[in-house]
Swiss-Prot record:
Its EC number is 1.13.11.60, 5.4.4.5. One of its GO terms (molecular function) is isomerase activity. It comes from Aspergillus fumigatus (strain CBS 144.89 / FGSC A1163 / CEA10) (Neosartorya fumigata). Heme b binds at residues 202, 377. This is Psi-producing oxygenase A. InterPro entries: Cyt_P450, Cyt_P450_CS, Cyt_P450_sf, Haem_peroxidase_animal, Haem_peroxidase_sf, Haem_peroxidase_sf_animal, Oxylipin_biosynth_metab, Ppo-like_N.
Length: 1079
């Protein structure tokens, strides 16, 4: 009998004996007497832990450890380890009576249940994808929660018995609130912070005068003061054209009764919305905003509404980011630290040891108590107090606003509001006049904003509300009483704050404490309002206390902020790139490297692109007055990153479009000066030593010309053309072999990202001794992609810093990477300087590189001039390299893009034939093909500043230019000028080679012109040899580009999250095998 058979027999015997034991046991049982139906009462026996452990092996213990670790730490489980299956095995292997098995199964079931929302909180469909005008539908299952026109909630149960005969409201004002003397805010917070607060308050609270229990606005941060409280109001603010709002308008009338700075901030949001919808339509991500014919009324209405609603989501997203990253950080005084921490309720939370994660997207209903929490009239500045007094004199001529009866005050406000037109564009604002297009003059709006940033707000506390607000405060006290709310102490207990036992605890000022005692008799009887605004104010603490508000308010507003944001579906689960688009989602995101995540500058610079420098302190930190910001940032060591000048209008540059005018300007070094010097010096300054001023493109002085001569001699040595051609043929083919692949048997490669860009990186690394990490140089520092990004950022910062909204971020990043690259390059150059030309250096830096000797010789020739190594690197090598990589890459990509287009592809068979001939004549024709393709697809524009008044003739028009005026030589239009290039849309191989514009003209013409033509023609030859060359299917085979000012192309990153000056990706396909690389 085999061992297996023996085991089977023994198992069968054991089973038989067990059954026999059950039969014997049953026969010995007494007759059942506990039940009426004659059945036995059975009791399920649970096995003990020792019995359970007998069924557990070491693998099961590891399963329990892995599951427990994940539960405790929140770490994701690696499903490749089959943990779920091991849990099932463990559960199934335990006895059916096992308590551990039952708990394990229940835990598994709970985990599976908790994986999904119950009920779901995010839904598909057009009805759920956008905010409704009245705020309803935020919670899809409870659509009315938080909607405009619904009652206030009550947060705190009012249990304290209060006297029906409470103190007279106006007496309370006179005793506790009336401003005796003005006190500046202790942290020098500007009035702009309180303008944001005013917008938030009126976004959330608008009490119905007919029924004070009702709020006429939604309970969400949805910018209803701009967009309206309901559909009727929203329709009044919309143009119903391309998703836009009426220019420089806002919905609410109430803001017209506030200092004009509040309205200016709303106008800034209006402009941001219109900027966003323009870009959304231009990008048209995934065909989402394809514009139909306006004659198709239904389709156009959908197009307009999709743009408007998405634009609103984006604008509200920036609004909330400003609240969380600028407003709340300033309230908590985190702006005085270098921390990037913020109280962001959108944080992803998971259940942990300290409790369950906070729910999200539940909806929100504002409470009446919080209507009172945000009454911050004590912080009104002296300037805004004067403005309010002047306004009230217009409303109540000849009367003292502090002595007007409540009835007269209400009648006066009613008359004022009734006179305001329903049409937003017709309402008066700050005495400003609208222009023909309906907008206000930027100068007027900027002046209001600038003065508001400089205006220090007042301090919180008792006896600090301007007397002009006497009637408003008295009405607020009456309104609070009509809501029958809890007392101050009850409100404090709700937040687990210690109740006040004495009046001196409420306010340490003996006068205020005594007044409270006379008015209320006992601390428990002090009303929530005005109680919360007469408390002592908190002292400044960095970080922690920046607003320095009253104690109870400081706690309550943080709870409210979390509820408002975390409870809003559109700020949490539906705040995604899929809802906002990739570009828009990225556009409003904070950056850790910029302003410690503050984002207010995104609003300012989009609203007023011609008034603020990209580094203006007025744009970046407007919630604190500039003089105090100077102290803060000096202490943090970042003050020198910002401009402290007041905003100043800079006219947009004058575009010059004709070929003849551009050639004339670029050749006239006396009248038209280059503009890049200050940026080059900014990037190249090192260890407090100035570098870069003498670089060839930094100016028009003699040292700049000498720089050009020196670098020209170093670059163009004997046999340079042969070596460059050989290098580019070799590297292009190498890159094709390395990065191409087959998809379903078809050859494919990203010709922009992996070939055009990287070939230039390898060239510059070889020539300028840059620390590129490759297979042959594994000790290099930067990968190919990293070095391209560095060179592209440097080039963009110097030559393409055209987007004011991204300027600060761009320039700070460019300086950081320039400094890092420069120090590493300097080390290489100093090694050459110390040792001369040595084979070991060549071999260790660039093994098998046909240009390595060329590069070391070039550095040696620069050193032979007697110039110090740091001057060579920072003033000459880095700026030259930075000007080559991205520029050469884009010219090749643009030229190839043309020949892959429908109109250009007719030339591909001839290019393919010429590329295979490998003769001088064929190469000359390929050069002409390259130059024509680059001309047709060029995106080059060169700026100049006018040094002396002059007149330029451009396309038959005489243009008068003033000294100091900035101009743009638009080489895109110049390259398509039919006067110079007859039939400009066609490829003609007999054009005059000296007329091509995309390398510039005159004394600052591209130094690498000859080198570039040889290099890029060689690349076209290598790519052109590929048979049946074509675009990859769909969008992957095309450059994502948009038309910018002057027709100059703007490209996008592969994920379309941002604009980029150069092509970033384009995939091509071809037939057949690649030629072998010749070493």
């Amino acid at each position: 009998m085999s061992e297996k058979q023996t085991g089977s027999a023994n198992g069968g015997l054991g089973k038989t004996l067990a059954q026999l034991e059950q039969v014997v046991s049953a026969s010995l049982r007494p007759l059942p007497s506990q039940t009426g139906d004659g059945t036995y009462v059975t009791e399920q026996v649970k096995t003990g832990i020792l019995k359970d452990l007998s069924h557990v092996d070491l693998g099961d213990l590891k399963t329990l450890v892995d599951v427990s670790k994940s539960a405790l730490t929140g770490e994701a489980l690696d499903d490749r380890k089959y943990i779920m299956e091991r849990v099932i095995q463990l559960s199934a292997g335990l006895p059916s009576t096992s308590q551990i098995g039952k708990e394990l199964t229940n835990t598994f079931l709970t985990t599976l249940w908790n994986d999904l929302e119950h009920p779901p909180i995010s839904y598909l469909g057009r009805d759920a994808m956008y905010r409704r005008a009245d705020g309803s539908g935020n919670n899809v299952l409870w659509p009315h929660i938080g909607a405009a026109g619904t009652p206030y909630a009550r947060s705190v149960q009012p249990k304290t018995v209060q006297s029906p005969n409470l103190p007279d409201p106006e007496t309370l004002f006179d005793c506790l609130l009336a401003r005796k003397e003005y006190k500046e805010h202790p942290n020098k917070i500007s009035s702009v912070l309180f303008y944001i607060a005013s917008i938030i308050i009126h976004d959330l609270f608008e009490t119905d005068r007919k029924d004070p229990a009702i709020s006429l606005t939604s309970s969400y941060l949805d910018l209803s003061p701009l967009y309206g409280n309901n559909q009727q109001e929203q329709d009044l603010i919309r143009t119903f054209k391309d998703g836009k709002l009426k220019p420089d308008c806002f919905s609410t009338k109430r803001v017209l009764g506030f200092p004009p700075g509040v309205g200016v901030v709303l106008i800034m949001f209006n402009r941001f919305h219109n900027y966003v919808v323009e870009k959304l339509a231009m990008i048209n991500e995934g065909g989402r905003f394809t514009k139909p014919q306006e004659s198709d009324t239904a389709a156009y209405a959908k197009y307009d509404n999709d743009l408007f609603q998405t634009g609103r989501l984006v604008t509200c997203g920036l609004y909330v980011n400003i609240i969380l990253k600028d407003y709340v950080r300033t309230i908590l005084n985190i702006n005085r630290t270098d921390s990037i921490w913020s109280l962001d309720p959108r944080s992803e939370m998971k259940d942990g040891l300290l409790g369950r994660a906070a729910a999200q997207a539940t909806g929100n209903q504002v409470a009446a108590e919080f209507n009172l929490v945000y009454r911050w009239h004590s912080c009104i500045s002296q300037r805004d107090q004067k403005w309010t007094e002047d306004m009230y004199q217009e409303l109540f001529p000849g009367q003292d606003p502090s002595k007007i009866s409540l009835q007269d005050f209400l009648r006066g406000l009613g008359r004022w509001e009734a006179k305001l037109p329903g049409e937003p564009r017709e309402r008066p604002f700050a005495g400003l006049q609208r222009k023909a297009d309906g907008s206000y003059d930027d100068n007027d709006l900027v002046k209001i904003f600038e003065e508001s940033v400089e205006d220090c707000a007042g301090a919180f506390g008792a006896l600090h509300v301007p007397t002009v607000f006497r009637s408003i405060e008295a009405l607020g006290i009456q309104q609070a009483r009509s809501w029958n709310l809890a007392t101050l102490n009850e409100f404090r207990k709700y937040f687990n704050l210690a109740p006040y036992k004495t009046f001196e605890e409420i306010n340490s000022d003996p006068y205020v404490a005594d007044q409270l005692k006379r008015l209320y008799d006992h601390p428990d009887r002090v009303e929530i309002y005005p109680g919360i605004i007469v408390e002592d104010a908190k002292e400044s603490m960095a970080p922690g206390s920046g607003l320095c508000t009253n104690f109870t308010i400081s706690r309550a507003i943080l709870s409210d902020a979390v509820a408002l944001v975390r409870g809003d579906r559109f700020h949490t689960v539906d705040f995604t790139p899929k809802h906002l688009t990739n570009w828009a989602y990225n556009e409003i995101q904070p950056q850790d490297s910029v302003d410690q995540t503050h984002v207010f500058y995104k609003l300012v610079l989009r609203a007023f692109p011609n008034h603020f420098r990209g580094d203006s302190i007025y744009a970046h930190f407007p919630l604190v007055v500039p003089s105090e910001n100077k102290k803060i940032l000096t202490k943090l060591g970042t003050a020198d990153k910002y401009s402290w000048d007041r905003p100043n209008y800079t006219p947009p540059p004058q575009f010059i479009n004709s070929h003849s005018a551009c050639m004339s300007i670029l050749s006239d070094q006396e009248t038209f000066k280059v503009t890049w010097g200050s940026k080059i010096e900014f990037l190249m300054r090192h260890n407090n030593q100035p570098y870069g001023r003498d670089f060839m493109l930094s100016g028009d002085r003699t040292p700049n010309a000498m720089s050009r001569q020196m670098m020209g001699k170093a670059l163009y040595r004997d046999k340079w053309e042969t070596e460059v051609k050989r290098f580019y043929e070799n590297i292009t083919l190498k890159l094709l072999h390395r990065y191409s692949y087959k998809l379903a048997g078809v050859n494919q490669v990203d010709v922009v990202r992996d070939i055009a860009n990287l070939a230039q990186v390898h060239f510059c690394a070889s020539v300028f001794s840059l620390p590129l990490k490759t297979e042959s140089n594994p000790r290099g520092i930067f990968t190919e992609s990293e070095l391209y990004q560095i060179m592209a950022v440097v080039f963009t910062s110097i030559f393409y810093d055209a987007d004011i909204g991204k300027s600060f971020e761009l320039n700070q990043a460019a300086r950081a990477v320039t400094q890092q690259l420069g120090q590493l390059t300097l080390a290489n150059v100093e090694l050459i300087a110390k040792t001369g030309f040595i084979a070991n250096l060549v071999n260790s830096l660039h093994r098998h590189d046909v240009l390595s000797e060329y590069g070391v010789h070039m550095i040696q020739r620069l050193l032979d001039s007697g110039m110090p190594a740091p001057e060579i690197v920072w003033t000459h090598v880095l700026p030259t390299a930075g000007g080559m990589v991205a520029n050469q890459a884009q010219l090749f990509s643009q030229s190839l893009d043309y020949y892959l287009s429908e109109e250009g592809s007719v030339h591909l068979p001839e290019i393919n034939r010429l590329a295979k001939e490998d003769t001088t004549e064929a190469d000359d024709l390929l050069l002409r093909y390259f130059m024509e393709g680059a001309r047709i697809r060029s995106s080059v524009a060169l700026p100049r500043v006018v040094a002396q008044p002059t007149v330029v003739e451009d396309n038959g028009q005489k243009i008068t230019l003033k000294q100091g005026q900035h101009i743009i030589c638009n080489l895109v239009s110049a390259s398509m000028d039919p006067v110079t290039f007859p039939e400009p849309d066609k490829v003609k191989l007999d054009r005059d080679m000296n007329l091509y514009a995309h390398f510039g003209f005159g004394p600052h013409q591209c130094l690498g012109l000859g080198l570039c033509k040889t290099a890029l023609t060689t690349m076209l030859k290598v790519i052109g040899r590929l048979d049946n060359l074509r675009r990859a299917p769909g969008g992957q085979g095309k450059l994502k580009k948009l038309s910018g000012p002057g027709g100059i192309a703007m490209y996008m990153t592969p994920d379309q999250t941002a604009f980029f000056p150069f092509p970033t990706t384009m995939k091509i396909q071809w037939d057949g095998d690649l030629p072998e690389v010749k070493e």
